[in-house]
Amino acid sequence: MNIAVLVSGSGSILEAILAAGIEVSLVVSDRPCRGLDIAGDANIEACLLSRSVYGGFSKDFDRVAYSDALTGLLDVRAIDLVAMAGFGTVLSGEIFNRYAGRILNTHPALLPAYPGWHAVEDALADGARVTGTTVHIATQVMDAGPIVAQAEVTIEAGDTVASLHERIKQVERVLYPQTISQVAQVLALGGSIEGSITPGQQG
């Protein structure tokens, strides 16, 4: 089972995945980051697929061309499962057909509540009492793919965005590796994520 992890930042989720004993074949980042260093230290192939070649972070960013380039990287390495781990680029195009049902993402809320980049802020602003983390299948529509697993996090009085996000991350670092392992087992047996894993509350 060849697993690729997509990162953009500190690599804390990647560290949790590796600490869980999951074998990772490839780590890809859209920018220079600590996640690539973690991969290198673990003797995992690390690849910088920089956004700068495709328009950077401007309105001219060619999302489809970038996604196609990433698809090529995955194809040539015969990747079976992709885990987005704090990856900061929204993908588009053929990659979701090529790897349909085989791209996982983790989100800091109990989807379908609070999709998007500001999930933690939105939950606090809404006065929610409970939020959490969701592992879902990534699709063309951001944060709208089938839910694979969820775990709740209680919002405490006096919580800030930083304090709540940190507690969500603590739960995420347990739930995501568990889910990746479960999904990998299903795929290795020739199954598919949808219909094989029952979404549920965990943790």
Regions found by a protein language model. Give the residues of each.
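One-carbon transfer enzymes
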Residues: M1-G203
